[in-house]
Structure formats: C-alpha cells, structure tokens
Amino acid sequence: MAADGYLPDWLEDTLSEGIRQWWKLKPGPPPPKPAERHKDDSRGLVLPGYKYLGPFNGLDKGEPVNAADAAALEHDKAYDRQLDSGDNPYLKYNHADAEFQERLKEDTSFGGNLGRAVFQAKKRVLEPLGLVEEPVKTAPGKKRPVEHSPVEPDSSSGTGKAGQQPARKRLNFGQTGDADSVPDPQPLGQPPAAPSGLGTNTMATGSGAPMADNNEGADGVGNSSGNWHCDSTWMGDRVITTSTRTWALPTYNNHLYKQISSQSGASNDNHYFGYSTPWGYFDFNRFHCHFSPRDWQRLINNNWGFRPKRLNFKLFNIQVKEVTQNDGTTTIANNLTSTVQVFTDSEYQLPYVLGSAHQGCLPPFPADVFMVPQYGYLTLNNGSQAVGRSSFYCLEYFPSQMLRTGNNFTFSYTFEDVPFHSSYAHSQSLDRLMNPLIDQYLYYLSRTNTPSGTTTQSGLQFSQAGASDIRDQSRNWLPGPCYRQQRVSKTSADNNNSEYSWTGATKYHLNGRDSLVNPGPAMASHKDDEEKFFPQSGVLIFGKQGSEKTNVDIEKVMITDEEEIRTTNPVATEQYGSVSTNLQRGNRQAATADVNTQGVLPGMVWQDRDVYLQGPIWAKIPHTDGHFHPSPLMGGFGLKHPPPQILIKNTPVPANPSTTFSAAKFASFITQYSTGQVSVEIEWELQKENSKRWNPEIQYTSNYNKSVNVDFTVDTNGVYSEPRPIGTRYLTRNLLLAAA
C-alpha cells in the first residue's frame, strides 16, 4: 500500500507513459502499436483447439478448424487491412467486429458464443466514448436498394396491412458468400424467438415464423422469406452441405383418411393392411440430396470416414395456390388467407417410414421440382384385415404450425454419436496377416498316418506352419457371418432358363409369411476375376433415369458391387466353409459337409455394407429389447433417434356451403395446392486420410472408360441422369492400422 499522498510505482509509470503518448498525439485515430500487428508466425492468445479465434495471432496457420475459426480468420484479415491503412481497429468498434458477430450469430459452440460476447462487450464499453462506427459503415454494401416490405395478408379479410412496413433482411445460411448480398433475418440453423407465453423449447422441434414486424422470418407477399443455397463448405475436419429444392404439395385424398389393404387374390406373402392420410412428408434421406457428384468425389478421395453431426431444415417462400375452372379455362392464383399445416414428430409417435428406400426424396439435381410424397403406413394384419393390435393415427391430433403465404418453418436437429462410416477398402486379407518369412512357433496336425513300406499305419504327426503351408497356420480372427445367395450372371447364356426369381431366392419366414433376404447381411459380390456374377438378392440395384417400374432389362438398372469386402466377408454365392459331420474311428473315415449359413461366432470380424451417392443415409433402429450390431442392411447409419418425420398438408377450405343446415360431413373443398422452397443443411465430421503408403492410390474418377458423353448431366431434353452408382471405398488401409 502506498503512503498517503503518493501513487504506487506501477500506477505512476502507467500514467506517465499515458501522458507522454497523449502529449505527442496527432489529429486522427491513434497509430497502432507494433505489438498489435498480426505476425504470420505468432500464436497470440488463441482459444485452445482453434487456430485464429483470439487476438494477435498470425494469418497463416493453415485451414480453419470450423466455422467460428473461419470467421475469426476473416476478422483478423480485416484488422490487418485497417492497420495497413493507419487505422487502429483495437480502439473502436468497427465494421469488422460487426461482420464477425453476424457470421457467428448461428454458431452455438463455446468459441462462437465467446467470440460474440467479447465484441458485444467491446461495443457496450466504447459506445459512451463515441468510438462505435456508424451503422452505415457497419452494414455491407448492397447491390440494390432494399425496398420497404409491401402489405402483408391480414388474418380475417385477406387485405394487406395499412402503411409501409419495415424492410426485412433475407435468409443467411451462415456461409461465407457474396459480401454484397442482402443478409437474411432467419438463418437456416437459428429458429425464431418463441412467441410470448411459450416455453423456450417450443421452437426446438420446429417452428413457423409468425406474421410480424420483428424480423422473425415472416415476410409479406412482395418479399422472399429466404434465399437459395446449394453448396458445400469444407473446413478441415468438417464439411457443411446445403441443398435447396422447389416442392409442390397437392391435396391428397380430398382431405380424407382411408384404409388401404392388399388386393383380393394376393398371396399370403403379399398381404398387408394400413392407412393413407391427407398429409405429405419431406424425405431427404439420400446422399445425393446433399452432395453433388463432384463434392462426393472430393469426400471419398480424401477421407477415410465421415458421419453426420447436425441438421438444419427450413421451409420458406410458402405459397398457397387456388385452382379454379371457368368456361374451360383453368386459373391459378395466390390465396393469401389459406394455410398449410406443418409439424415434426419429434417423439416418433407415428410409424416411421424414412429409410425404406422410397421414392419422393429431394431430387439430386437442384433445378428439378419435386412432389412431396403422401404419408401412409402399415399396421398389424391378418391377411388383408386388421387385428386387435392394429393402430390408427389422426395427424390432426398433433399440434401443428399453420403457415400462410410468406411464412417459413425451421427445425434443428443433432445426430446421436455414431461410428464413422469406413470409406476405404482393405489392402490386406484377413487370412493373410502373417509374416511369410518366419515360421510359426505353434504346430498343427500335418499327418494322420505313417507310410511303412508298401502300407500305411495310423500315426499322428505335427509340423510348424510356414509360407509353404500358409493355409494351415493358426489365426486369431474369422470372417463374418454368411447367409448364402443364388449366383446370377450378367451374361444371360450363363443362367438357367427357368423362372427362379422367387423359388430360387434366399428368404426368411416371419409370422407365416416369406420375405426376400434383400439385400441381407453384407457379403462380397463375387470372387476374384468373376465380375460378371452377382448374388441374386445380395446387392443394391438402382434404376436409371426413365426406367419403367417392372421387368426392365439389365441395361436400365445399376447393380452395385461389394467386391472390396471380400478381404473380411464371405462371398455371398459361396459356402462359408465346411464342418465335420461324424466321429472317425478305425472303420469309419472322417466326413465333412458344406456350411451355407453361418451365424456370428466369437472372433468374427467384418465390414458393413458400403454407402452410395444414390443410397440412404440412415435407418431407424427398431425399438426392441434386444438387437445385435444394428447396422442397416441397405447401408448408412443405424440411429435410435434419427431426424424426425416432418409432415405437411394443405388446410381444407370448404367450397360454397349450402345456405341450409346439413348434418352430413362436408365433402366439397376448393381446389388448392401449395409450393415453396425447402433447404436442408447438414454438418458432417470427416476422418482425413493420412496414409504412409508409397505407391499411388486408386481413386474415384469420371474417366473410367472412353466416352463421348458427360456423366451426371442433362440430355437434350433437359433430363438429368446418374449413369452409375458411386460408393466410397477407393482409398485403402491395412487391416491392422489403428483407428483414429
């Protein structure tokens, strides 16, 4: 403690230095101190786990680790430019700070929250001192003036609100894009604030933006409520894919629920019973809904694995259309007072149909417009009839958002932790893991009789196994399970000319019904040098663009090939092995038989089925007491709590009711459909390849043969096509490489 009337030495030194600097101060902003400049080789005060999130760090530390780190790098560059111009950004809240906060407004990570908080505090501290740039400097320049929002539809009369409404910003997906574009009020990953009276978790499972002047995403008829984004952002060990498509929703079943069942005369194996509903649902459970062919190429040629982490969903630019007929002329007009209803089944109360390889997903080509599929489901049946345990669901029993033209709907979801998909092939075989130069110290039974002159005598002999008898060596691991399939050739002359598509197929029996084992457990498609063969029901078969539904030729389908897993998995069309079937003795020789099915044994190791650009991303694991290695047999990630179903329907509007009362159910409605855009953003975690292999890898490429056509493009009629399936296993790893 300093004596009365005296200042402490440290405070005196600080004040003296400040007075000296003030005495020499020149007009204009103070010059930056040398220590304030970014140095390319400096670490600075960077948050652990980041490269740029923190002050005084260098600008050349490699790729940012995530979106917050990328925003920090852009912020550092902006500071560097200000320092070069003689401005000192550290002593005022400036446009770079505002843009940094804008980029992080969707980021809920620790680093993102901390970055926003620091610069919000900086702004609050400097505001009373007049050291905050004017808003005109803070906002990015616009390519055109932002018009005032036109009138919005009123809830009762259909007329607009009186007077000019404040201009609204547009959707910001959190991507680093055109600095001149108009920012959006409703980020894809940021649900709007909950209306008063609702809990804070009300919007966590999906929300509709209300018609209001509070920048919650609701826009009038004249303004779009979101922007189109189709791209991918690569950030070190992450990639964010964003897809936007245009959808159309008809009115299904004339707003009715209906029973559906198998037709009379159907075989017992084909009987079913269920319900169709007037609702549709959004299905984006295919990889090509999110990855372009080029992005898929980048993904599989540079990574050993990937898995989904987060998902953001948004419906926007919703338009309800009314169709009228007058003297043979069809008129389509906006209906500003009609609504659509949307909700997410976050509790999985409804039968879950996503992941069953249905049509109706977002199309792979962004320019194509798709129809929202109708929601229907099956329940327990006896033949074509219901039983006591059969369930029926009324979807109007669920709370839903009612949205009009100009509204939007958002939903955010976090994937459960799942293993990385193994996007690599093995460069070793499970039965060839040994050193061929060294014999084993273990022995094996090499002979059971001993030659003696011209006869043989019973006698046991043992040997150590080496390279010359590698088949006899002791091994730690067994190949995976087997459920044998019939072999089919792509060359018709190699096949029997009888009809065996059902009678010769591998099937399982459940509740008195047979079903194909299709595709069944992951097994290799064929042996070496037998590419023309494939298992009858053991592979995924995709249709080419324009293929008919039934009995199409082989040239119109795409047959996948799981040949890369034959290093660990049995070949589907071969026996698993052989097994002893008797007890040998003096007068009885040892006998064996083929093993065509083999369940799981201790010591088994195997690979799951590969995933394909055209294939599913996930499947819901059934809710049962027991399950074993629930990896979906069609490929993808097995999830106990997958992205919930998002359901939508056009709200019925009665058409010209009678002026006299009738107790009958109303069955006449105006003809309506709805349309708009849907955007889905998914963040994927990547497992970068870091092989020490010397010789070049096999990688996916489009120049696999000489062609005069461009793959994955449109034809002269504007029809987009995918000419072949693309899996993920081109890079290699050895079998015993440690997991990352």
Which residue ranges define each predicted feature?
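Extended terminal accessory/targeting regions
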Residues: 2-154, 170, 177-178
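Capsid-like jelly-roll
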Residues: 139-740
